[in-house]
Protein backbone atom coordinates (compact mmCIF):
# COMPACT_ATOMS: atom_id res chain seq x y z
CA UNK A 1 0.00 0.00 0.00
CA UNK A 2 1.37 3.41 -0.93
CA UNK A 3 1.05 6.55 1.16
CA UNK A 4 -2.24 8.40 0.82
CA UNK A 5 -2.66 11.97 2.07
CA UNK A 6 -5.82 14.00 2.50
CA UNK A 7 -5.45 16.97 0.15
CA UNK A 8 -7.42 20.02 1.27
CA UNK A 9 -7.30 21.26 -2.31
CA UNK A 10 -9.15 18.25 -3.75
CA UNK A 11 -10.98 17.38 -0.51
CA UNK A 12 -10.00 13.76 -1.00
CA UNK A 13 -7.42 11.16 -0.02
CA UNK A 14 -4.85 10.94 -2.78
CA UNK A 15 -1.99 8.55 -3.47
CA UNK A 16 1.18 10.53 -2.84
CA UNK A 17 4.06 10.57 -5.26
CA UNK A 18 6.67 13.34 -5.09
CA UNK A 19 7.44 15.39 -8.18
CA UNK A 20 11.06 14.28 -7.97
CA UNK A 21 11.11 10.52 -7.19
CA UNK A 22 12.57 9.85 -3.75
CA UNK A 23 12.76 13.51 -2.74
CA UNK A 24 9.90 15.23 -0.90
CA UNK A 25 9.90 19.02 -0.72
CA UNK A 26 7.66 20.32 2.06
CA UNK A 27 6.87 23.85 3.27
CA UNK A 28 5.06 24.56 6.54
CA UNK A 29 4.03 27.99 7.78
CA UNK A 30 5.88 28.73 11.00
CA UNK A 31 5.52 31.26 13.77
CA UNK A 32 5.09 34.99 13.77
CA UNK A 33 7.68 35.69 16.44
CA UNK A 34 6.21 38.39 18.64
CA UNK A 35 5.37 36.15 21.64
CA UNK A 36 6.02 32.71 23.12
CA UNK A 37 4.74 29.58 21.36
CA UNK A 38 1.28 28.45 22.46
CA UNK A 39 -0.50 25.10 22.33
CA UNK A 40 -1.65 25.67 18.76
CA UNK A 41 1.96 26.03 17.66
CA UNK A 42 2.84 22.84 19.54
CA UNK A 43 0.09 20.97 17.71
CA UNK A 44 1.31 22.10 14.29
CA UNK A 45 5.00 21.53 15.05
CA UNK A 46 4.41 18.00 16.34
CA UNK A 47 2.01 17.11 13.50
CA UNK A 48 4.42 18.05 10.73
CA UNK A 49 7.41 16.66 12.62
CA UNK A 50 5.65 13.29 12.51
CA UNK A 51 4.92 13.78 8.80
CA UNK A 52 8.56 14.40 7.94
CA UNK A 53 9.73 11.55 10.20
CA UNK A 54 7.40 9.10 8.44
CA UNK A 55 8.41 10.30 5.00
CA UNK A 56 12.04 9.66 5.92
CA UNK A 57 11.21 6.28 7.46
CA UNK A 58 9.51 5.44 4.16
CA UNK A 59 12.77 5.99 2.31
CA UNK A 60 12.35 9.54 1.04
CA UNK A 61 14.88 12.32 1.25
CA UNK A 62 13.00 15.27 2.74
CA UNK A 63 13.72 18.96 2.33
CA UNK A 64 11.59 20.52 5.03
CA UNK A 65 11.20 24.30 5.15
CA UNK A 66 9.44 25.96 8.08
CA UNK A 67 9.57 29.72 7.83
CA UNK A 68 9.76 32.40 10.49
CA UNK A 69 7.68 35.55 10.06
CA UNK A 70 9.89 38.22 11.63
CA UNK A 71 8.15 41.28 10.20
CA UNK A 72 4.47 41.89 10.91
CA UNK A 73 2.13 44.48 12.45
CA UNK A 74 2.01 42.52 15.72
CA UNK A 75 5.79 42.38 15.90
CA UNK A 76 6.08 46.13 15.35
CA UNK A 77 3.48 46.88 18.04
CA UNK A 78 5.08 44.54 20.58
CA UNK A 79 8.58 45.93 20.01
CA UNK A 80 7.30 49.49 20.45
CA UNK A 81 5.43 48.47 23.62
CA UNK A 82 8.57 46.82 25.00
CA UNK A 83 10.84 49.67 24.01
CA UNK A 84 13.18 47.34 22.13
CA UNK A 85 14.29 46.90 18.56
CA UNK A 86 12.41 44.52 16.31
CA UNK A 87 15.56 42.45 15.83
CA UNK A 88 16.00 42.14 19.59
CA UNK A 89 12.40 40.97 20.03
CA UNK A 90 12.43 38.51 17.15
CA UNK A 91 15.83 37.04 18.06
CA UNK A 92 14.62 36.47 21.61
CA UNK A 93 11.37 34.84 20.47
CA UNK A 94 13.19 32.64 17.94
CA UNK A 95 15.50 31.40 20.70
CA UNK A 96 12.43 30.62 22.82
CA UNK A 97 10.80 28.86 19.86
CA UNK A 98 13.83 26.62 19.43
CA UNK A 99 13.92 25.80 23.14
CA UNK A 100 10.24 24.83 23.13
CA UNK A 101 10.60 22.79 19.93
CA UNK A 102 13.65 20.98 21.30
CA UNK A 103 11.77 20.15 24.51
CA UNK A 104 8.96 18.57 22.48
CA UNK A 105 11.40 16.47 20.48
CA UNK A 106 10.84 18.41 17.26
CA UNK A 107 13.59 17.77 14.73
CA UNK A 108 14.91 20.99 13.22
CA UNK A 109 13.66 21.67 9.68
CA UNK A 110 16.16 21.53 6.84
CA UNK A 111 15.77 25.28 6.38
CA UNK A 112 14.21 27.92 8.62
CA UNK A 113 14.19 31.13 6.55
CA UNK A 114 13.40 34.48 8.12
CA UNK A 115 11.12 36.68 6.04
CA UNK A 116 13.40 39.72 6.38
CA UNK A 117 16.18 37.81 4.60
CA UNK A 118 14.10 37.32 1.43
CA UNK A 119 12.73 40.79 0.67
CA UNK A 120 14.46 40.91 -2.77
CA UNK A 121 12.65 37.72 -3.80
CA UNK A 122 9.36 39.22 -2.61
CA UNK A 123 9.94 42.37 -4.65
CA UNK A 124 10.70 40.25 -7.70
CA UNK A 125 7.47 38.28 -7.35
CA UNK A 126 5.40 41.44 -6.86
CA UNK A 127 6.97 42.86 -10.01
CA UNK A 128 6.03 39.74 -11.98
CA UNK A 129 2.45 40.01 -10.74
CA UNK A 130 2.26 43.66 -11.73
CA UNK A 131 3.66 42.86 -15.19
CA UNK A 132 0.86 40.31 -15.64
CA UNK A 133 -1.83 42.75 -14.59
CA UNK A 134 -2.52 40.92 -11.33
CA UNK A 135 -1.21 43.67 -9.03
CA UNK A 136 -1.68 47.42 -8.84
CA UNK A 137 -0.57 50.31 -6.65
CA UNK A 138 -3.44 51.92 -4.80
CA UNK A 139 -3.95 55.58 -4.04
CA UNK A 140 -2.51 55.04 -0.56
CA UNK A 141 0.77 53.72 -1.96
CA UNK A 142 0.18 50.07 -1.09
CA UNK A 143 0.54 47.45 -3.81
CA UNK A 144 -2.42 45.05 -3.86
CA UNK A 145 -3.28 41.77 -5.54
CA UNK A 146 -6.31 41.99 -7.84
CA UNK A 147 -8.24 38.95 -6.64
CA UNK A 148 -10.93 38.94 -9.34
CA UNK A 149 -8.28 38.86 -12.07
CA UNK A 150 -6.99 35.47 -10.88
CA UNK A 151 -9.43 32.83 -12.20
CA UNK A 152 -8.62 30.14 -9.64
CA UNK A 153 -9.18 32.23 -6.52
CA UNK A 154 -11.28 30.32 -3.98
CA UNK A 155 -10.30 26.82 -5.05
CA UNK A 156 -8.67 25.97 -1.72
CA UNK A 157 -11.48 27.27 0.50
CA UNK A 158 -14.12 26.02 -1.93
CA UNK A 159 -16.05 29.28 -1.97
CA UNK A 160 -17.05 31.55 -4.79
CA UNK A 161 -15.78 35.11 -4.89
CA UNK A 162 -19.21 36.39 -3.90
CA UNK A 163 -19.14 34.23 -0.75
CA UNK A 164 -15.65 35.11 0.33
CA UNK A 165 -15.09 37.83 2.89
CA UNK A 166 -11.94 39.74 3.58
CA UNK A 167 -9.99 37.65 6.07
CA UNK A 168 -8.80 38.49 9.53
CA UNK A 169 -5.45 39.89 8.38
CA UNK A 170 -6.80 41.53 5.20
CA UNK A 171 -7.61 45.12 6.10
CA UNK A 172 -10.06 46.81 3.71
CA UNK A 173 -8.49 50.13 2.77
CA UNK A 174 -9.46 53.12 0.62
CA UNK A 175 -6.66 52.39 -1.82
CA UNK A 176 -8.11 49.03 -2.86
CA UNK A 177 -10.16 48.51 -6.00
CA UNK A 178 -12.05 45.61 -4.41
CA UNK A 179 -12.61 44.65 -0.73
CA UNK A 180 -11.21 41.17 -1.44
CA UNK A 181 -7.93 42.49 -2.79
CA UNK A 182 -5.05 41.97 -0.41
CA UNK A 183 -1.83 43.80 0.18
CA UNK A 184 1.47 42.68 -1.31
CA UNK A 185 3.57 45.70 -0.33
CA UNK A 186 2.73 48.11 2.47
CA UNK A 187 3.86 51.69 2.05
CA UNK A 188 5.87 53.02 4.99
CA UNK A 189 4.08 54.92 7.73
CA UNK A 190 5.88 57.85 9.41
CA UNK A 191 5.68 56.37 12.90
CA UNK A 192 7.10 52.98 11.95
CA UNK A 193 10.69 52.12 12.91
CA UNK A 194 13.33 52.53 10.22
CA UNK A 195 14.32 48.87 10.52
CA UNK A 196 11.02 47.81 8.90
CA UNK A 197 11.46 49.97 5.82
CA UNK A 198 12.89 48.75 2.53
CA UNK A 199 13.32 50.55 -0.79
CA UNK A 200 11.16 49.29 -3.65
CA UNK A 201 9.96 50.36 -7.11
CA UNK A 202 6.73 51.46 -5.38
CA UNK A 203 8.38 53.48 -2.66
CA UNK A 204 9.72 52.70 0.79
CA UNK A 205 7.72 50.08 2.67
CA UNK A 206 7.61 46.44 3.74
CA UNK A 207 6.13 43.19 2.45
CA UNK A 208 2.66 41.93 3.24
CA UNK A 209 2.30 38.69 5.18
CA UNK A 210 1.10 36.49 2.33
CA UNK A 211 3.83 37.32 -0.19
CA UNK A 212 6.48 36.29 2.34
CA UNK A 213 5.58 32.60 2.22
CA UNK A 214 5.10 32.54 -1.55
CA UNK A 215 8.53 34.04 -2.16
CA UNK A 216 10.34 31.88 0.40
CA UNK A 217 8.60 28.70 -0.77
CA UNK A 218 9.48 29.29 -4.41
CA UNK A 219 13.04 30.35 -3.59
CA UNK A 220 13.85 27.38 -1.38
CA UNK A 221 11.79 24.57 -2.93
CA UNK A 222 11.13 25.65 -6.50
CA UNK A 223 8.05 27.08 -8.17
CA UNK A 224 6.20 23.75 -7.75
CA UNK A 225 6.75 21.45 -4.77
CA UNK A 226 5.10 18.53 -3.00
CA UNK A 227 3.48 19.45 0.32
CA UNK A 228 2.39 22.73 1.87
CA UNK A 229 1.15 22.54 5.45
CA UNK A 230 -0.13 24.64 8.31
CA UNK A 231 -2.96 25.06 10.78
CA UNK A 232 -6.58 24.96 9.63
CA UNK A 233 -6.86 28.66 10.49
CA UNK A 234 -4.41 29.43 7.67
CA UNK A 235 -6.47 27.82 4.92
CA UNK A 236 -8.22 31.14 4.25
CA UNK A 237 -7.08 33.75 3.60
CA UNK A 238 -3.37 33.01 3.94
CA UNK A 239 -3.01 29.83 1.91
CA UNK A 240 -5.64 30.89 -0.60
CA UNK A 241 -3.63 34.06 -1.15
CA UNK A 242 -0.37 32.15 -1.42
CA UNK A 243 -1.84 30.08 -4.26
CA UNK A 244 -3.07 33.20 -6.06
CA UNK A 245 0.29 34.99 -5.77
CA UNK A 246 2.50 32.03 -6.59
CA UNK A 247 0.47 30.57 -9.44
CA UNK A 248 -0.32 34.03 -10.74
CA UNK A 249 3.39 34.82 -10.94
CA UNK A 250 4.68 31.48 -12.25
CA UNK A 251 1.75 29.97 -14.12
CA UNK A 252 2.53 26.65 -12.39
CA UNK A 253 0.76 24.68 -9.63
CA UNK A 254 2.28 25.90 -6.34
CA UNK A 255 1.94 22.76 -4.19
CA UNK A 256 0.68 19.29 -5.09
CA UNK A 257 -0.79 18.63 -1.67
CA UNK A 258 -2.21 21.01 0.95
CA UNK A 259 -2.32 19.66 4.52
CA UNK A 260 -4.01 21.36 7.48
CA UNK A 261 -3.89 20.29 11.11
CA UNK A 262 -6.99 20.70 13.26
CA UNK A 263 -7.76 23.33 15.87
CA UNK A 264 -6.99 23.00 19.56
CA UNK A 265 -9.61 23.63 22.25
CA UNK A 266 -9.20 23.92 26.00
CA UNK A 267 -11.85 22.09 28.03
CA UNK A 268 -14.04 22.05 24.89
CA UNK A 269 -13.79 25.80 24.34
CA UNK A 270 -11.72 27.67 21.77
CA UNK A 271 -8.40 28.72 23.26
CA UNK A 272 -8.24 32.50 23.57
CA UNK A 273 -6.73 35.10 25.85
CA UNK A 274 -10.15 36.71 26.36
CA UNK A 275 -11.54 33.47 27.83
CA UNK A 276 -8.56 33.11 30.15
CA UNK A 277 -7.75 29.65 28.79
CA UNK A 278 -4.71 30.59 26.72
CA UNK A 279 -1.62 28.48 27.44
CA UNK A 280 1.91 28.76 26.15
CA UNK A 281 3.98 25.63 25.69
CA UNK A 282 5.98 26.72 28.73
CA UNK A 283 2.84 26.97 30.84
CA UNK A 284 1.99 23.37 30.00
CA UNK A 285 5.54 22.09 30.54
CA UNK A 286 5.44 23.41 34.10
CA UNK A 287 2.74 20.82 34.82
CA UNK A 288 3.53 17.96 32.43
CA UNK A 289 6.70 16.47 31.00
CA UNK A 290 7.39 17.20 27.35
CA UNK A 291 7.01 13.63 26.08
CA UNK A 292 3.56 13.39 27.66
CA UNK A 293 2.55 16.56 25.80
CA UNK A 294 3.92 15.15 22.55
CA UNK A 295 2.12 11.83 23.11
CA UNK A 296 -1.12 13.71 23.84
CA UNK A 297 -0.83 15.37 20.41
CA UNK A 298 0.32 12.28 18.51
CA UNK A 299 -2.41 9.92 19.62
CA UNK A 300 -5.06 12.09 17.96
CA UNK A 301 -5.22 12.33 14.17
CA UNK A 302 -3.62 15.51 12.91
CA UNK A 303 -6.81 16.68 11.15
CA UNK A 304 -9.06 16.14 14.19
CA UNK A 305 -9.80 18.86 16.74
CA UNK A 306 -7.67 18.38 19.85
CA UNK A 307 -9.16 19.06 23.27
CA UNK A 308 -6.65 20.04 25.95
CA UNK A 309 -7.61 19.33 29.54
CA UNK A 310 -5.93 18.07 32.70
CA UNK A 311 -7.96 14.86 32.40
CA UNK A 312 -6.63 14.20 28.90
CA UNK A 313 -3.03 15.08 29.83
CA UNK A 314 -3.10 12.84 32.89
CA UNK A 315 -4.57 10.07 30.77
CA UNK A 316 -1.78 10.57 28.23
CA UNK A 317 0.80 10.37 31.00
CA UNK A 318 -0.71 7.11 32.25
CA UNK A 319 -0.79 5.62 28.76
CA UNK A 320 2.81 6.60 28.05
CA UNK A 321 3.78 5.13 31.40
CA UNK A 322 2.35 1.75 30.34
CA UNK A 323 4.54 1.78 27.25
CA UNK A 324 7.66 2.72 29.20
CA UNK A 325 6.84 0.08 31.82
CA UNK A 326 7.03 -2.58 29.12
CA UNK A 327 10.41 -1.25 27.96
CA UNK A 328 11.67 -1.28 31.55
CA UNK A 329 11.20 -5.07 31.76
CA UNK A 330 13.90 -5.97 29.25
CA UNK A 331 16.64 -4.07 27.45
CA UNK A 332 15.35 -3.48 23.90
CA UNK A 333 17.45 -5.09 21.18
CA UNK A 334 18.79 -2.91 18.38
CA UNK A 335 16.60 -3.94 15.45
CA UNK A 336 16.16 -2.87 11.85
CA UNK A 337 12.42 -2.81 11.30
CA UNK A 338 11.16 -5.70 9.16
CA UNK A 339 8.07 -4.16 7.58
CA UNK A 340 6.77 -7.68 6.86
CA UNK A 341 6.47 -8.34 10.59
CA UNK A 342 2.71 -8.39 11.32
CA UNK A 343 2.84 -5.56 13.89
CA UNK A 344 5.18 -3.45 11.75
CA UNK A 345 2.93 -4.02 8.73
CA UNK A 346 -0.10 -2.81 10.70
CA UNK A 347 1.84 0.23 11.89
CA UNK A 348 2.89 1.03 8.32
CA UNK A 349 -0.66 0.58 7.00
CA UNK A 350 -1.91 3.04 9.62
CA UNK A 351 0.73 5.66 8.86
CA UNK A 352 0.32 5.23 5.11
CA UNK A 353 -3.36 6.13 5.45
CA UNK A 354 -2.99 9.89 5.93
CA UNK A 355 -0.55 9.54 8.84
CA UNK A 356 -3.01 7.60 11.01
CA UNK A 357 -1.26 8.03 14.34
CA UNK A 358 -4.17 6.80 16.55
CA UNK A 359 -4.07 3.40 14.84
CA UNK A 360 -0.26 3.41 14.86
CA UNK A 361 -0.23 4.09 18.62
CA UNK A 362 -2.65 1.17 19.09
CA UNK A 363 -0.01 -1.08 17.51
CA UNK A 364 2.52 0.17 20.07
CA UNK A 365 0.21 -0.97 22.87
CA UNK A 366 -0.16 -4.39 21.22
CA UNK A 367 3.62 -4.74 21.22
CA UNK A 368 3.85 -3.53 24.82
CA UNK A 369 1.38 -6.23 25.85
CA UNK A 370 3.52 -8.81 24.06
CA UNK A 371 6.66 -7.55 25.84
CA UNK A 372 4.84 -7.84 29.17
CA UNK A 373 4.05 -11.49 28.36
CA UNK A 374 7.23 -12.64 26.65
CA UNK A 375 9.95 -10.33 27.99
CA UNK A 376 11.34 -10.49 24.44
CA UNK A 377 14.21 -8.08 23.77
CA UNK A 378 13.46 -8.25 20.02
CA UNK A 379 9.81 -7.28 20.55
CA UNK A 380 10.87 -4.47 22.87
CA UNK A 381 13.31 -3.33 20.19
CA UNK A 382 10.56 -3.29 17.57
CA UNK A 383 8.34 -1.31 19.93
CA UNK A 384 11.05 1.28 20.46
CA UNK A 385 11.94 1.47 16.75
CA UNK A 386 8.34 1.99 15.60
CA UNK A 387 7.72 4.54 18.35
CA UNK A 388 10.77 6.41 17.10
CA UNK A 389 8.88 7.10 13.86
CA UNK A 390 6.54 9.17 16.05
CA UNK A 391 9.32 10.71 18.13
CA UNK A 392 8.34 8.66 21.20
CA UNK A 393 9.89 6.18 23.67
CA UNK A 394 13.50 7.11 22.97
CA UNK A 395 14.25 8.05 26.58
CA UNK A 396 15.41 5.92 29.50
CA UNK A 397 12.38 3.99 30.83
CA UNK A 398 13.39 4.23 34.47
CA UNK A 399 14.05 7.96 34.20
CA UNK A 400 10.55 8.46 32.77
CA UNK A 401 8.88 6.21 35.33
CA UNK A 402 10.69 7.88 38.21
CA UNK A 403 10.07 11.45 37.07
CA UNK A 404 7.88 13.69 39.17
CA UNK A 405 8.96 12.43 42.60
CA UNK A 406 9.62 15.92 43.86
CA UNK A 407 9.64 15.43 47.62
CA UNK A 408 12.37 12.76 47.79
CA UNK A 409 15.52 12.46 45.75
CA UNK A 410 16.57 9.16 44.22
CA UNK A 411 19.24 8.54 46.85
CA UNK A 412 16.74 8.82 49.71
CA UNK A 413 14.34 6.48 47.94
CA UNK A 414 17.06 3.89 47.32
CA UNK A 415 18.04 4.11 51.00
CA UNK A 416 14.45 3.33 52.01
CA UNK A 417 14.36 0.42 49.55
CA UNK A 418 17.56 -0.94 51.11
CA UNK A 419 16.07 -0.56 54.61
CA UNK A 420 12.96 -2.42 53.46
CA UNK A 421 15.11 -5.20 51.99
CA UNK A 422 16.92 -5.52 55.33
CA UNK A 423 13.59 -5.66 57.18
CA UNK A 424 12.35 -8.41 54.84
CA UNK A 425 15.60 -10.34 55.31
CA UNK A 426 15.02 -10.14 59.06
CA UNK A 427 11.40 -11.26 58.49
CA UNK A 428 10.20 -7.96 59.98
CA UNK A 429 7.20 -7.83 57.64
CA UNK A 430 5.50 -5.03 59.56
CA UNK A 431 8.49 -2.70 59.09
CA UNK A 432 8.82 -3.65 55.42
CA UNK A 433 5.14 -2.88 54.89
CA UNK A 434 5.45 0.41 56.78
CA UNK A 435 8.28 1.55 54.50
CA UNK A 436 6.29 0.60 51.40
CA UNK A 437 3.25 2.56 52.60
CA UNK A 438 5.37 5.56 53.63
CA UNK A 439 6.92 5.71 50.18
CA UNK A 440 3.51 5.40 48.55
CA UNK A 441 2.35 8.43 50.54
CA UNK A 442 5.31 10.29 49.00
CA UNK A 443 4.16 9.29 45.51
CA UNK A 444 6.58 6.35 45.12
CA UNK A 445 5.36 2.94 43.96
CA UNK A 446 7.62 -0.06 44.64
CA UNK A 447 7.73 -3.00 42.24
CA UNK A 448 9.18 -6.29 43.49
CA UNK A 449 10.56 -8.88 41.07
CA UNK A 450 13.03 -11.79 41.23
CA UNK A 451 15.69 -9.33 40.04
CA UNK A 452 15.04 -6.97 42.94
CA UNK A 453 12.92 -3.92 43.75
CA UNK A 454 12.46 -0.97 41.43
CA UNK A 455 10.40 2.15 41.91
CA UNK A 456 8.44 4.65 39.87
CA UNK A 457 6.34 7.73 40.39
CA UNK A 458 2.70 7.09 41.20
CA UNK A 459 0.19 8.22 38.60
CA UNK A 460 -1.26 11.66 39.22
CA UNK A 461 -4.91 12.04 39.73
Curated annotation (Swiss-Prot):
GO MF annotations, alphabetized: ATP binding; cysteine-tRNA ligase activity; zinc ion binding
Catalytic activity, EC: 6.1.1.16
Binding site for Zn(2+): 29, 213, 238, 242
BP-aspect Gene Ontology terms: cysteinyl-tRNA aminoacylation
UniProt keyword list: Aminoacyl-tRNA synthetase, ATP-binding, Cytoplasm, Ligase, Metal-binding, Nucleotide-binding, Protein biosynthesis, Zinc
Cross-referenced InterPro entries: Cys-tRNA-ligase (IPR015803), Cys-tRNA-synt_Ia_DALR (IPR015273), Cys-tRNA/MSH_ligase (IPR024909), CysS_C (IPR056411), Rossmann-like_a/b/a_fold (IPR014729), tRNA-synt_1_cat_dom (IPR032678), tRNAsynth_Ia_anticodon-bd (IPR009080)
Reported cofactor(s): Zn(2+)
Annotated catalysed reactions: tRNA(Cys) + L-cysteine + ATP = L-cysteinyl-tRNA(Cys) + AMP + diphosphate
Lineage: superkingdom: Bacteria
Span(s) of short sequence motif 'KMSKS' region: 270-274
Motif 'HIGH' region location, chain numbering: 31-41
Any GO CC annotation of this UniProt entry: cytosol
Details of cofactor binding: Binds 1 zinc ion per subunit.
Cellular compartments annotated: Cytoplasm
Enzyme class: ligase
SUPFAM superfamilies xref list: Anticodon-binding domain of a subclass of class I aminoacyl-tRNA synthetases (SSF47323), Nucleotidylyl transferase (SSF52374)
Residues that bind ATP: 273
Pfam families membership: CysS_C, DALR_2, tRNA-synt_1e
Family: Belongs to the class-I aminoacyl-tRNA synthetase family.
Subunit structure: Monomer.
This protein's name: Cysteine--tRNA ligase
Organism: Delftia acidovorans (strain DSM 14801 / SPH-1)
Phylogenetic classification of the source organism: Bacteria, Pseudomonadati, Pseudomonadota, Betaproteobacteria, Burkholderiales
Gene symbol of the encoding locus: cysS
